[in-house]
């Protein structure tokens, strides 16, 4: 079952969040953090997929601080709009929304909540691990993680990257690995966005492998 709820951050900002509920008792809570394209069809499908695996899933509309109801396509126009919206919102404010979503997911599931993020959401997932209190974190192709590599994760972290990703140099990932050898890092024969079936860079094999590892990771730590 899915629905949209309104949540409130600790600065009183209200934002929408897509909720996907599992059948039966939740295994744990899970926050799905969007790419720069909003809580679109793909992100909702990701949330639904995790709900099928038993998680109580919540995807916050982090662009609500700049514009409501953002759903962008995977083309140049959508990318430009997403980047423009991103630049209007301070990352600390975005993390307030993620934090509020974490508390909601944990409260509603009655279990610890993790975070999984994609693209920009992958970077936010990393910052959730270093600044917030999730149970565990997974990040997919977070291109800005290297900028925050000096921050130490408080919880177990797994990161997924594509070897054909033109946006993320392998040297950047190496810096993160050197600083935090305890972080699980996996490489795939894919490009940026290899998990998204709506992108030309979608790689089914890589997507399935990453999902299997992600589920095993969350099942271990949440």
Where are these regions (language model features)?
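N-terminal cap/leader regions of alpha/beta-hydrolase-fold enzymes
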Residues: 1-222
